[in-house]
């Protein structure tokens, strides 16, 4: 399978916090070279390397986490390869009509715990969905985002998986915009048998009076990137304020 290489759009930079984030729009890209590039970036980075968020759309591919069980691929499709990778989690599907955001962050520099990063990613997805009038929620013990209302209540709309290496993250989150959902029927998504998977268009998402379509995917991707940068900046600002408070001597009464 041959796909287009990284697009030339970007990078652009969010400078809301002490540690700015570069956002790279890579366009449609085959999974394996993108995965290789993430690992190479993480291995080569130094304490001065800027953090990045990559926005990507992949041709059809199943990815299986490092501890994943291949049995969760229920009905293999010779047209869709499966790639074993080093993120956490089980099996998921990537394909056209889905926004994928990879977070290449120095967690040590940001003083950010992995659980905090997962929470921030989920919050960014919730904020993005809310902008398109979709109500969603977290589920304890099941990373990702699920619809909380409507006929598809409980269906998964965003999947999340990370790898931490030397205090730096890669991999990230995928958000279904308007896509062929049939490949999800061939797997137990994220290892959960019978879990429904949905996209923003099927769920009735809309921006003002315009229903979500694949044509809005670039805007949705940028909105998600902005939300990710905003929640990370907000956490950084809170931590900085707490540090300043702790460093301020108490006044004698």
From Swiss-Prot:
PROSITE patterns: BPL_LPL_CATALYTIC, LIPB. Pfam families: LplA-B_cat. The active site is at 190 (acyl-thioester intermediate). One of its GO terms (biological process) is protein modification process. Residues 47-236 form the BPL/LPL catalytic domain. Substrate binds at residues 87-94, 159-161, 172-174. Its main location: cytoplasm. Gene3D superfamilies: Bira Bifunctional Protein, Domain 2. Disulfide bonds: none annotated. Catalyzes the transfer of endogenously produced octanoic acid from octanoyl-acyl-carrier-protein onto the lipoyl domains of lipoate-dependent enzymes. Lipoyl-ACP can also act as a substrate although octanoyl-ACP is likely to be the physiological substrate. PANTHER family: LIPOYLTRANSFERASE 2, MITOCHONDRIAL-RELATED (PTHR10993:SF7), OCTANOYLTRANSFERASE (PTHR10993). This is Octanoyltransferase. The lineage of its organism: Bacteria, Pseudomonadati, Pseudomonadota, Betaproteobacteria, Burkholderiales. The gene is lipB.
């Amino acid at each position: 399978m041959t796909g287009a290489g990284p697009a030339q759009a970007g990078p652009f930079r969010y400078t809301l916090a002490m540690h700015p984030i570069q956002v790279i729009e890579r366009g449609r890209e085959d999974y394996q070279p993108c995965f290789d590039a993430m690992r190479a970036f993480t291995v080569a980075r130094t304490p001065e390397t800027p953090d990045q968020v990559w926005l990507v759309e992949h041709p059809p591919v199943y990815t299986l986490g490092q501890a994943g069980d291949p049995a969760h691929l229920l009905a293999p499709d010779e047209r869709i390869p499966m790639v074993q990778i080093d993120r956490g989690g089980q099996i998921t599907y990537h394909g056209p009509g889905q926004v994928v955001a990879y977070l290449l962050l120095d967690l040590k520099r940001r003083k950010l715990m992995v659980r905090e990063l997962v929470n921030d990613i989920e919050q960014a997805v919730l904020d993005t969905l809310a902008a398109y009038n979709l109500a969603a929620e977290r589920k304890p013990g099941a990373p990702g985002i699920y619809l909380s209302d409507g006929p598809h209540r409980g269906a998964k709309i965003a999947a999340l998986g990370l790898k931490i290496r030397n205090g730096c993250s890669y991999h990230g989150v995928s958000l279904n915009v308007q896509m062929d959902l049939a490949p999800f029927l061939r797997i137990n998504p994220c290892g959960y048998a019978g879990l429904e998977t949905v996209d923003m268009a099927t769920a009735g998402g809309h921006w003002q009076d315009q229903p979500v379509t694949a044509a809005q995917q670039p805007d949705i991707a940028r909105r998600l990137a902005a939300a990710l940068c905003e929640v990370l900046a907000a956490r950084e600002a809170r931590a900085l304020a707490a540090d300043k408070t702790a460093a301020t001597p108490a006044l004698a009464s």
